[in-house]
């Protein structure tokens, strides 16, 4: 399995034949033509757009590495969001949208940058785990590794969370 991790995340596999099944369509997997007649069988998942937005809201005061470190310090914060929820596509204020989502769903509301970041990173890792499980169900195969490429491959904490959530080795 690979994740092309950036503003958006593309998660999937490369295969020789497309999967045009109803189940594949229902789970939002797509087939993109690739090199030598292969297909990239992928799912588009919210990526680091949420973290990028939160960072911009504080005038880029922190580097992505600093945000990762703050998130790791707040790793026990319990709240989660559905990172693919439409409310996160283009909110007026991502920080407030994350807080509002937690409030609406009866969860603890994050207050610090670290808490907000850990909610986002953990929620993304859980989205990746769900997509990996769907991919395995659709293909009838089990995958032991996830290869992360792109700018998000530098988000060490997210990669650790992804390994934990999926039970797979993550190589970035």
Language model segments and positions:
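Active-site core segments that coordinate phosphate-bearing ligands/cofactors
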Residues: 1-146, 154-172
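Small/polar loops that bind or transfer phosphate-bearing groups
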Residues: 150
């Amino acid at each position: 399995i690979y994740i092309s991790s950036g503003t958006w995340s593309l998660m999937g596999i490369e295969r020789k034949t497309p999967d045009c099944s109803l189940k594949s369509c229902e789970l939002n997997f797509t087939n993109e033509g690739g090199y030598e007649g292969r297909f990239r069988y992928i799912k588009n998942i919210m990526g680091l757009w949420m973290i990028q937005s939160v960072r911009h809201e504080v005038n880029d005061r922190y580097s992505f590495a600093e945000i990762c470190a703050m998130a790791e310090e707040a790793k026990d914060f319990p709240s989660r969001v559905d990172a693919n929820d439409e409310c996160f596509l283009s909110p007026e204020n991502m920080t407030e949208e994350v807080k509002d989502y937690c409030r609406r769903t009866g969860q603890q509301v994050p207050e610090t940058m670290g808490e907000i970041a850990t909610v986002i990173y953990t929620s993304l890792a859980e989205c990746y785990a769900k997509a990996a499980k769907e991919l395995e169900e659709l293909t009838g195969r089990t995958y032991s590794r996830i290869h992360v490429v792109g700018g998000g491959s530098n988000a060490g904490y997210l990669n650790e969370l992804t390994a934990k959530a999926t039970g797979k080795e993550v190589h970035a």
